[in-house]
């Protein structure tokens, strides 16, 4: 009999109950007891969903009040010492302070969970870190499930993955030195679970899918030799990529079963079947835990039946990874059109699919004939739908030539024509795109969406906001202006709503971090642009000023990364379709007299595969997509791109290959350290390193920004340097925005004056160096949360 289980379930609730309870607690409108009660209700509901569908075990420990890595850090007692907290007496208020900061301490660092759009809190480790235990929440959740008569299977992030994802701020400290002490903490956890009669514990080790050095591979041997002496059976779970090259070594570990991801890496099945010990179970992740499309159940059954014949009761079935990454339920999607809805499966529907697969294998197809027929019908509907495949889009894709991804002239020639056309000063000043989204702007958009105001009144209100933004920029003395994006709710959804091939859910929320949830749009079919999207707005904004006005677009890779993407064609193909749609908009903006066009790609690095061997293939099609979107214009039209806070050094050749005339990047929090890689690489085009942090309400001084510009000029010649904030200003208020931009313009003018006075054509230090005031902080490969504004 094949067993069924899941690796984890979304914790937010089908109506985002956890989010609203968290935020009420933070405001002081709910007590800790009331928040705990909401959490307990959600856990019971989610366990019952699993039990009602006949799953053999229910996942416990997958719940977290903020983040599972933070909860594990608390469970182990490894809290950052700078907070001065007693792990054994940790309250929820203190737990949230670790994630959100307090008056004395900034929050723990947050970064992406592997290559997903979920964020985790990074443990802070050093030689004095201890793992003596913390609050009993993890065990209490297992007790809750057991008290309900359920077979609980607690879920833990494994010790090697935990160390791999941690950081130390002590130079040269080897995190693996903590492994012996960490394993003692894990053994105490497993001992307590054994005492409760727990049969199986799931230990997640997705790090086994990464490029690991020998010392880290050896750590698996050490870790599981130690944990074998503890009680419950261990299911070692891998996901997000293949672990086939480590299958032989992993199979020798003293564990009782393995989970592998057959959605991301179906080719690894043979290697694991060959390596699997005779006693071990093999859990196959056959339902996509990261996307929202219904599973082709008959195709999966064709894969599973030979495995069942070989393994019998040692075969387990599961989603590919935790269902954390998909919305909770389709039940509340009342406005989604019937056809598109029939193609989708959220977390609850994926439980149904899993149940059908288990029953088909164990009892025969006849028992689930109706469900299999519905699956067949959904697959046939997608294949046949005229909404999915558009002949004109296919013809246009086939006609794309290599030359379409190239500008007419090399950068050295283009930039001279652009300088003549734009007549900008040395160190031109600009912003990244968005300006403060005031309550009035949000109310206007909401009123229009609800039908309370008509299209004409909406347009008049938005144009009034644009006029305000233009006047403020001119008064500040900025050189290249933006319209402020008052009409945009989100940098992906705004464009997706105007592109064919996109759909939108009402309640398709997934957790990004903490209480922040995102509702990604759905790319279900061939993408194309039926009509211009931003041209009228840009033309109006340009009519208000003689200074250059930037057209503002979201790039094809960011549109791809921040959506649920169709799974019936390669992502590279969808990226090319997006690129052609954006290319049309770029060309129309140029025809409308827009001389500077920005194509934002904050998510470019996020798309990198987990293994470096796969990077080149991804970067090739991703860069080509950007170039295809940007290369239809004349030489004198200047193309900008923006990338958020990320580690760029290892992909600088790809960034240079994008061939944007100007790239703006987020650098102020690293005190311009991120810029040094561009200098070492001799980045050939123009660059605008951010000179102040838009995530903070603090207004930096003129002198502080001058110091950052001085440092930037040591890396990039002033003739190729732009002056701008780190990112868009949507989340800030006008008072702080105007003050900060005024200081930024003053800093640029002061540096211009110093350069002019010295007659400098190349940079030499013009003043005694002073330490930059922006403190360097660790950075990760993420777009900043200011860009990911489709959240709530």
From Swiss-Prot:
It comes from the Bacteria. L-methionine binds at residues 432-434, 485, 600. Zn(2+) binds at residues 642, 644, 666, 727. GO terms for molecular function: 5-methyltetrahydropteroyltriglutamate-homocysteine S-methyltransferase activity; zinc ion binding. Keywords: Amino-acid biosynthesis, Metal-binding, Methionine biosynthesis, Methyltransferase, Repeat, Transferase, Zinc. Transmembrane segments: none annotated. Its cofactor is Zn(2+). Pathway: Amino-acid biosynthesis; L-methionine biosynthesis via de novo pathway; L-methionine from L-homocysteine (MetE route): step 1/1. Its EC number is 2.1.1.14. Binds 1 zinc ion per subunit. 5-methyltetrahydropteroyltri-L-glutamate binds at residues 16-19, 112, 516-517, 562, 606. GO terms for biological process: methionine biosynthetic process; methylation. It catalyses: 5-methyltetrahydropteroyltri-L-glutamate + L-homocysteine = tetrahydropteroyltri-L-glutamate + L-methionine. L-homocysteine binds at residues 432-434, 485, 600. Signal peptide: none annotated. Gene3D superfamilies: 3.20.20.210. The active site is at 695 (proton donor). Belongs to the vitamin-B12 independent methionine synthase family. PANTHER family: 5-METHYLTETRAHYDROPTEROYLTRIGLUTAMATE--HOMOCYSTEINE METHYLTRANSFERASE. Catalyzes the transfer of a methyl group from 5-methyltetrahydrofolate to homocysteine resulting in methionine formation. This is 5-methyltetrahydropteroyltriglutamate--homocysteine methyltransferase. It comes from Cupriavidus necator (strain ATCC 17699 / DSM 428 / KCTC 22496 / NCIMB 10442 / H16 / Stanier 337). The gene is metE.
């Amino acid at each position: 009999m094949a067993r069924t289980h899941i690796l984890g379930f979304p914790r937010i609730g089908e109506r985002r109950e956890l989010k609203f309870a968290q935020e009420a607690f933070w405001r002081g409108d709910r007590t800790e007891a009331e928040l705990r009660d909401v959490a307990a209700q959600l856990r019971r509901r989610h366990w019952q969903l699993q039990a009602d569908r006949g799953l053999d075990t229910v996942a416990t420990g997958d719940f977290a009040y903020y983040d599972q890595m933070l909860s594990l850090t608390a469970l182990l007692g490894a809290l950052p010492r700078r907070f001065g907290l007693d792990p054994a007496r940790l309250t929820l208020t203190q737990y949230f302070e670790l994630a959100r900061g307090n008056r004395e301490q900034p929050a723990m660092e947050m970064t992406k969970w592997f290559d997903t759009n979920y964020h985790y809190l990074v443990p802070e480790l050093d030689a004095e870190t201890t793992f003596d235990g913390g609050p009993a929440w993890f065990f209490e959740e297992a007790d809750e499930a057991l008290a309900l008569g359920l077979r609980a299977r607690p879920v833990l992030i494994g010790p090697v993955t935990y160390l791999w994802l941690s950081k130390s701020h002590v130079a040269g400290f080897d995190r693996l030195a903590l492994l012996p002490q960490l394993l003692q903490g894990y053994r105490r956890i497993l001992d307590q679970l054994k005492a409760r009669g727990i049969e199986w514990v799931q230990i997640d080790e997705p790090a086994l899918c990464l490029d690991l050095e020998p010392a880290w591979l050896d750590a698996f041997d050490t870790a599981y030799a130690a944990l074998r002496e503890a009680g419950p059976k261990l299911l070692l779970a891998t996901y997000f990529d293949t672990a086939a090259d480590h299958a032989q070594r992993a199979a020798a570990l003293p564990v009782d079963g393995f989970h592998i991801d057959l959605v991301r890496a179906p080719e690894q099945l043979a290697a694991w079947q060959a390596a699997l010990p005779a006693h071990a179970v093999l859990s196959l992740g056959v339902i996509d835990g990261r996307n929202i499309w219904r599973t082709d159940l008959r195709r999966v059954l064709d894969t599973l039946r030979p495995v069942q014949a070989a393994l019998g009761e040692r075969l387990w079935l599961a989603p590919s990874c935790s269902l954390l990454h998909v919305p909770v339920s389709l039940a509340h999607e009342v406005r989604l059109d019937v056809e598109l809805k029939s193609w989708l499966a959220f977390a609850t529907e994926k439980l149904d699919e899993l149940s059908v697969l288990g029953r088909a294998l164990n009892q025969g197809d006849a028992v689930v004939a109706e469900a299999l027929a519905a699956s067949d019908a959904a697959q046939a509907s997608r294949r046949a739908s005229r909404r999915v495949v558009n002949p004109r889009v296919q013809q246009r894709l086939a006609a794309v030539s290599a030359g379409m991804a190239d500008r007419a002239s090399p950068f050295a020639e283009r930039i001279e024509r652009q300088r003549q056309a734009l007549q900008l000063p040395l160190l031109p000043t600009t912003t990244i795109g968005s300006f403060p989204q005031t309550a009035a702007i949000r109310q206007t958009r909401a009123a229009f969406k609800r039908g309370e105001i008509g299209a004409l009144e909406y347009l008049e209100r938005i144009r009034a906001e644009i006029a305000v933004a233009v006047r403020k920029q001119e008064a500040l003395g900025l050189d290249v202006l933006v319209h402020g994006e008052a009409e945009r709710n989100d940098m992906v959804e705004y464009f997706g709503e105007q592109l064919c091939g996109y759909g939108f859910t009402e309640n398709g929320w997934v957790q990004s971090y903490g209480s922040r949830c995102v509702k990604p749009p759905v790319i279900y079919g061939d993408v194309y642009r039926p009509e211009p999207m931003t041209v009228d707005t840009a033309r109006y904004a340009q009519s208000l000023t003689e200074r250059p006005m930037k057209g503002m677009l979201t790039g094809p890779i960011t549109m791809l990364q921040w959506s649920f993407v169709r799974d019936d064609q390669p992502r590279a193909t969808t990226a090319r379709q997006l690129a052609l749609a954006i290319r049309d908009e770029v060309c129309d903006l140029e025809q409308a007299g827009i001389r500077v066009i920005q194509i934002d790609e904050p998510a470019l690095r996020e798309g990198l595969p987990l293994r470096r061997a796969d990077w080149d293939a991804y970067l090739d099609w991703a860069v080509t997509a950007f170039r295809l979107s940007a290369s239809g214009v004349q030489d004198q039209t200047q193309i900008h791109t923006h990338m958020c806070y990320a580690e760029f050094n290892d992909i600088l050749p790809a960034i240079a290959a994008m061939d944007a005339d100007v790239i703006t990047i987020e650098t102020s929090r690293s005190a311009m350290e991120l810029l040094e890689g561009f200098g070492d690489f001799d980045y050939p085009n123009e660059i605008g390193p951010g000179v102040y942090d838009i995530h903070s309400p603090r207004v930096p001084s003129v002198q502080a920004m001058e110091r950052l510009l001085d440092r930037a000029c040591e890396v990039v010649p002033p003739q190729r340097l732009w002056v701008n904030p780190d990112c868009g200003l949507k989340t800030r208020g006008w008072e702080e925005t105007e003050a900060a931009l005024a200081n930024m313009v003053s800093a640029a003018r002061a540096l211009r004056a110093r350069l002019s006075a010295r007659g400098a054509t190349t940079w030499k230090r013009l003043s005694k160096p002073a330490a930059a005031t922006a403190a360097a902080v660790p950075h990760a490969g993420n777009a900043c949360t200011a860009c990911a504004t489709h959240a709530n």
